[in-house]
Amino acid sequence: AIELRKIMSAGQLVSDDILNKIVFDKLANCKSGFILDGYPRTLEQSSFLNNFLTKLSLNLHFIFNIDIDFETLKMRIHKRSLEENRDDDNAEVVETRFNAYINTTKKVSDYYKNNQPTIFYEINGNNEIEKITSKIIKILEK
């Protein structure tokens, strides 16, 4: 846990092997459902997740991609940094993570958008938090 915190505080992505193990350990006991936030972030993690779910005879029901522009993201994280004391809430880390998203995670989003379009939902993350939450709840209630 300490090693993970160091990696995340530097704005780096945790390795696929470590994250896949964590997900495997947690999902193996989640027979009634689960929510993944920030995973998968790479195509390799996506492949692992797909294979893992197939082995457990589980399916994804919803995939949300909350798309937000960099300026709005910086503003929200700055606000969060005033309310919470997180090591990873600084401008350098935010920029590193945003670049990682552009370079790796967007490929995962595109993969699911193209391969599972019936469960993939693009959400405008520039809207107010309440509006984003309301949109997600409406989709879940369908």
Regions found by a protein language model. Give the residues of each.
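Small-molecule kinase domains that catalyze NTP-dependent phosphoryl transfer to phosphate-bearing small molecules
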Residues: V14, I18-L27, R86-I132
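Conserved nucleotide-binding/hydrolysis micro-motifs of P-loop NTPases
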Residues: P40-E44, D67-K74, E128-I129
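A glycine- and Lys/Arg-enriched "phosphate-lid" helix/loop adjacent to the NTP-binding pocket
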Residues: E3-M8, L53-T105
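ATP-dependent small-molecule kinase phosphotransfer cores
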Residues: A1-N51, E83, E92
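C-terminal alpha-helix
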Residues: K135-K142
